Amino acid sequence: MKKYFLFIALFFPLLMCSCGGDDPTPKPKEPEKGKVNTRMVLTGTFVEFFDKDNWEQSQWNNLLDEMKQIGLNTVIVQFAAFNDKVWYDGNNAFTPNKGKFALARLLAAAEQKQMDVYIGLYFDNSYWQNQTNENWLRLHAERCITVAEQVNALFGHSPAFKGWYIPHEPEPNAYNTDEKVASFRNLFVNKISNRLHQINNKPVSIAAFWNSDLTSPQQLQHFMAELSKANLQVIMLQDGVGVGHVKMIKLADYYKAAAKGLYTENTAYQGEFWTDLETFTVSELPASIERIKQQLTLELGVDKVSKAVSFQYYKNMCPTGPYGREAGKLRQAYFNYVKSLQ
């Protein structure tokens, strides 16, 4: 489960960059397209709006510019609405509080940088107590659809808007029978996804997770096979390394099992398999570049995994984000790694 919580100028170290700030210093060049093997690097990241209600357009422009500099081309908005709050100019009885500029400004920045955005729907924290509650699933599917209809009315024209993200994270310990997965799939995921495809037919994604103390590779395989019977075009798997759900020595086995479930046990799934790579430690600090390189090697080394996105750039790699200097060190080290591949 997620926590809610190179040209390089020799005399201008990367720590001078400003994530979300106004910074006139020269920016390092982006990795050249076609020069970096995308099976060795991150190409996307999640973004949360919790601490960004009042960001100006220039701050969003700078943040996405700095993401693009290290090769990220995809932004996944974790949620457009959370609990009682919405981050676009829409009115709902279930989200009375509004931060109406965040989503609009992020999309404008993404258009400027020619980046793709997957927009997350509505999430309420009571999901964790109601994962198999059919009445709850029905109600919150309707709420997700309401948010999607409003988002599409406002931003459906945006060239940066490439897909949807269902922010409810399924896992095999809660959905531990075929019947429970089918209930989640049919009452919730398919109800949302079928409507999304009527609205604009953009791809729909979700991010599953697992805990190796509770789930074997074989159980994850079968769970992924059952989940992928849903109307989904992208299924991500959270690697669990940051939250301590798996030891590195077991990581490849779980990813191979997940891929086998998606494409062998369920031969009908035609969608993509992405890895959601955690760039933090159990103490929530930014991880080391050595660990992240190992994660990339193991996860993208599984043939069916087509893309690696991180959770998440702003907290773990942005020098003016919550972890400041430590995040800046990781960003510098990761940027150097990407440049070394060219």
Spans of features found by a protein language model:
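Catalytic domains of carbohydrate-active enzymes, especially glycoside hydrolases
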Residues: 58-84, 226-236, 299-309
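Aromatic-lined carbohydrate-recognition surfaces of secreted/lumenal glycan-active proteins
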Residues: 118-130, 138, 162-169, 188-220, ...
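Bacterial Sec-dependent N-terminal signal peptides
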Residues: 9-36
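Boundary/entry segment of secreted carbohydrate-active catalytic domains
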Residues: 27-80, 210
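An active-site-proximal structural segment forming one wall of the substrate-binding cleft
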Residues: 98-113, 133-163, 195, 224-228, ...
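Active-site groove signature of glycoside hydrolases
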Residues: 122-125, 147-179, 309
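Substrate-binding cleft of secreted/luminal carbohydrate-active enzymes
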Residues: 162, 232-248, 261-342
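Aromatic-lined substrate-binding rim segments of carbohydrate-active enzymes
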Residues: 60-126, 180-206, 250-261
